[in-house]
Amino acid sequence: MPTETLQADSKPVGQGGAFASAVPLRILNKGPDYFRRQTEPNPKRLSAVERLEADKAKYVKSQEVINAKQEPIKPQVLAKPPVCPVPLKRGGGVGSGLKASNNNAKSDTCATTTKRENLNLEILKNILNSSSSSEGPAKGTSHKVGARSWAPHRSSELSEPGCRSFTDSLKVPPSTQGRHSPQGGNLNLSRRLLEERSCEVDGERSPLHASHSSSDIRRMCNGKPLRAARSSSSSAPPLPPKPSAKALAACDNAPCSPERETLTSTAAELELGSSVARRPSLHRSKSDLSDRYARAGADVERFFNYCGLDPEELESVGVESFARANSDIVSLNFRSASMISSDCEQSRHSNDDLTDEEDDAGERVPYGISAVERNARIIKWLYSIKQARESQKVSHV
């Protein structure tokens, strides 16, 4: 193939040729008005809401709905705050304009803060007046925590001993480093004194439980075990030793307090729970199991006693052959009954020693006739019946 043809084919196609191939000639011949009509919106075309409004009489029966016109739902326009124009100096330049805007913003923020402070002061006045009229003069010191954000001429009114600020009632004042509030210290001291007094009163009433604190007694009264109380409170004292019989008798003679009664009842419940936990789980005795096996064997033997023979055949064969054939099964029944009685005696002895029975329960196997032995006896019995029939036939011939 010559190189000239390749060069002629590899010439790039012009832009006009590409546009002509993309757009057909019949559209290009229509002119620019055709494209302008497509871009402009069609004023004659109705929207879906307008079409429904026009056809409302077709699908609506009531005249009120037909006459009512549906207005389009418009989104709510949020009102923007008015922005005051900032006067700019001619010779000031950009820096002066920025300074003026900063000063304006500062003045706006100051005005809003003063308005908020005035509102807060009015609310606080109303609350203080209502609280003073309902509760009366209260004892306490002045709270100066929230007064720093208010005006100086109002702080003297709020620093009176009977007044209490709304913010202080909602917020807890932060404790300074190394110092605690006097009210908290007084509360802690009063709690300690109350606990010591309750311990002394309990020690005078019950000498046995004098080492317990009031918190431990409350836990015992609620029904929680002593071990849980030990783990929860690290400073709990150790449990007292078990009281002797003399001490218990002295406690019975003395008038019992309700706390002591609850303590004794919880101790009794704990002892009962431990005794219940010590008891072993109930096991089925050997006699019950052997009785079950013997009953199952008796049912099977009843079924195979006459091997499904008719009473006429039984009369012809004779009961003697069945008695002779059943001797093995009858001996087996006697043996199983004797084993049941021996198992009953063993169960009586084993009930006395529960621990020994638990140890030997895994090793013991309940007595029962094996399936192989039972099948062998039944086959032997059937074979004896067959022999009796054959002998009877021979004798008749």
UniProtKB/Swiss-Prot annotation:
Sequence segments annotated as region (Disordered): 130-247
UniProt subcellular location: Cytoplasm; Cytoplasm, Cytoskeleton, Microtubule organizing center, Centrosome
Superkingdom of the source species: Eukaryota
Basic and acidic residues biased stretches: 192-207
Keywords per UniProt: Cytoplasm, Cytoskeleton
Main localization, broad class: cytoplasm
GO cellular component, as recorded: centrosome; cytoplasm
UniProt feature, compositional bias: Low complexity: 224-236
InterPro entries documented for this protein: FAM110 (IPR025740), FAM110_C (IPR025741), FAM110_N (IPR025739)
Recorded family membership: Belongs to the FAM110 family.
Name used for this protein in its record: Protein FAM110B
Organism whose genome encodes this protein: Danio rerio (Zebrafish)
